[in-house]
């Protein structure tokens, strides 16, 4: 396995990551997870050198993080970096951000998330997140040790957009 250091964070992570959006049949719309198989798959990936695992609050009807949390018991959490995502379209206040973070930490059975991302961000959602104080929320998370960093993955074109 090849590893890379993530920017200025100094976090060493595998070049190959494991995405937890689709487990057994979820690609065809089936969101019922065979938990035993999914946990086994995640642990085999980690045992094989994968250290970067990606999930999100909404994946698999909000069950992906639960299964990942179970897979990361027995010392597996200490071997990985977790990236998960807050859904901008499901938050309307800082209280919503705090509630979702609390749910995610509980489901993942951890006290911190390494990479906390704003999910499916586009310009409109970015403006919404800024308006409800998401940037300050993410800064507070980092200060409190609940996140190493925050970011905004995007599949939508935002070229030439000012994100400040």
Q: Where are these predicted regions, by residue range?
A:
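Structural motif corresponding to the early beta-alpha repeats
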Residues: 59, 75-94, 119
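Glycine/proline-rich, positively charged
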Residues: 91-164
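Hydrophobic faces of well-ordered beta-strands that scaffold small-molecule active sites
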Residues: 14-18, 53-55, 80-84, 113-118, ...
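Conserved radical SAM core fold
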Residues: 23-25, 87-88, 120-123
């Amino acid at each position: 396995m090849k590893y890379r250091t993530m920017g200025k964070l100094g976090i060493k992570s595998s070049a190959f990551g494991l995405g937890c959006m689709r487990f057994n049949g979820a690609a065809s719309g089936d969101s019922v997870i065979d938990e035993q198989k999914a946990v086994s798959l995640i642990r085999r990936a980690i045992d094989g050198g994968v250290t970067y695992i990606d999930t999100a609050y909404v994946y698999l009807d909000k069950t992906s993080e639960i299964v990942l949390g179970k897979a990361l018991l027995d010392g597996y959490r200490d071997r990985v970096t977790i990236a998960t995502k807050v859904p901008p379209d499901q938050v309307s206040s800082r209280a919503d951000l705090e509630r979702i973070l609390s749910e995610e930490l509980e489901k993942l059975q951890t006290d911190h998330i390494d990479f906390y991302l704003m999910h499916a961000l586009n310009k409109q959602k970015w403006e919404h997140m800024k308006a409800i104080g998401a940037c300050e929320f993410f800064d507070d998370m980092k200060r409190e040790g609940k996140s190493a960093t925050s970011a905004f993955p995007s599949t939508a074109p935002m070229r030439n957009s000012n994100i400040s």
